[in-house]
C-alpha cells in the first residue's frame, strides 16, 4: 500500500503547504510548460488551460517507464492562479520594474484572483474555477519599494502574496482566501473526493 493519495502536478510551495496542512499525503510530479497567454485570452480561460496542460504534462511524464515503474495509478491534481485587473492578466513579474508597475496598478483598486483546479486520472478529468475579488489600499512609493526589496513579489502572480507581507495591502476580500493563495480548499477537497480521495 502506498503512503500517498495522489500526485501534485505543481511547483508551487504554497499549494503543497496548503495540502499538507489539510493532512493530505501526496507525491510531487510536475514539469515545465509554456505559460504564455494566447492573444486576447480571458483570465478564466487562461488559468483553466494552464491547469489542464499542467495535468496532462505530468500524467504524460508519469507514463514514461522510468517514472511509472512501481508507482501506483492515482489521481493527479494541478492548479493555476492569475491576478486579473481590467481584463488584463498579471502574471509573475519579469523584474523589479515590472513588479513596481503591477503594484502601482493594483493600488486603491479591486482586482480578481482566478484559480482553476484540475483533477484527472486515466478515466476522467474534472475541473473547477474559483474567483475572488481583492481590494488594495492606497500604496505609497515607499511601501512598494520596500516590499519589492524583500524579494517576496518576484515569484507571485500579480506581484504579491496575500498570506505573507503582501497581506498588509489588502483592505477587503470577497471569495476564498486559500484561492487567492493558489488553491481554494473547499473546491479542491470536493474534486478530490470525487476521485475517492477523502479527508474524513
Swiss-Prot record:
Gene Ontology MF: a single term: UTP diphosphatase activity
Active-site residue numbers: 80 (proton acceptor)
Enzyme class: hydrolase
InterPro entries: ITPase-like_fam, Maf-like
Intracellular or extracellular location(s): Cytoplasm
SUPFAM superfamilies attached to this UniProt entry: ITPase-like
EC number in record: 3.6.1.9
Gene3D superfamilies listed in its UniProt record: 3.90.950.10
GO cellular component, one term: cytoplasm
Keywords from the named record: Cytoplasm, Hydrolase, Nucleotide metabolism
Keyword Hydrolase: yes
Residue(s) at site: Important for substrate specificity: 14, 81, 163
Cofactor(s) annotated in UniProt: a divalent metal cation
One GO term (biological process): nucleotide metabolic process
Catalytic activity: dTTP + H2O = dTMP + diphosphate + H(+); UTP + H2O = UMP + diphosphate + H(+)
Superkingdom of origin: Bacteria
HAMAP family: Maf
NCBIfam families cross-referenced by the UniProt entry: maf
Family named by the database record: Belongs to the Maf family. YhdE subfamily.
PANTHER family cross-referenced by the UniProt entry: BIFUNCTIONAL DTTP/UTP PYROPHOSPHATASE/METHYLTRANSFERASE PROTEIN-RELATED, BIFUNCTIONAL DTTP_UTP PYROPHOSPHATASE_METHYLTRANSFERASE PROTEIN-RELATED
Biological role stated in the UniProt entry: Nucleoside triphosphate pyrophosphatase that hydrolyzes dTTP and UTP. May have a dual role in cell division arrest and in preventing the incorporation of modified nucleotides into cellular nucleic acids.
The protein's name: dTTP/UTP pyrophosphatase
Gene source species: Pasteurella multocida (strain Pm70)
